[in-house]
């Protein structure tokens, strides 16, 4: 008999802000769920980055191409891309259909299905299982086959909410970019040990930086 699952409720597309930056902020404190025949893996989203319209670092900046079409789907669809031939990155489309923008899921706090995650990342401490975008996709078993998946459908791989209410959100500049480094488009849960990146980037949250479920 399986352990009782957390009562995570799928997020509907209409609940998602129709703005890339606000969506990246909104997703802090929400949940990423991966359902498998052998059980469920889930985690609380503690870090995201926004790649809005017109951002030269976005994969959508050059316009629609065969490889980036999922960024041009209506908000709430997965865009999965292999980076530097090493790690898959899980992004989500963030605007109206045909616009082209996205957010990157950078880290989660693992909650359900820890043995399943640990099997994919053996010998790794809990804190580091999904702390960073490449680690996240490895722990959850996310690859190219998930590109274009509707994350609002509540099956296979999906986004959800557990607690309704306000969540405090910190904001800093993004990580690992060679241009547009000054923009405050990285969002995180203050105090979380599962946030990636240099500790010096974890600045005091800006006044009023709260998101509501």
Swiss-Prot record:
Belongs to the DNA glycosylase MPG family. Keywords: DNA damage, DNA repair, Hydrolase. SUPFAM superfamilies: FMT C-terminal domain-like. GO terms for molecular function: alkylbase DNA N-glycosylase activity; DNA binding. It holds the Pfam family Pur_DNA_glyco. Its EC number is 3.2.2.-. GO terms for biological process: base-excision repair. The keyword rRNA processing does not apply. This is Putative 3-methyladenine DNA glycosylase. The keyword Hydrolase applies. It comes from Paraburkholderia xenovorans (strain LB400). The lineage of its organism: Bacteria, Pseudomonadati, Pseudomonadota, Betaproteobacteria, Burkholderiales.
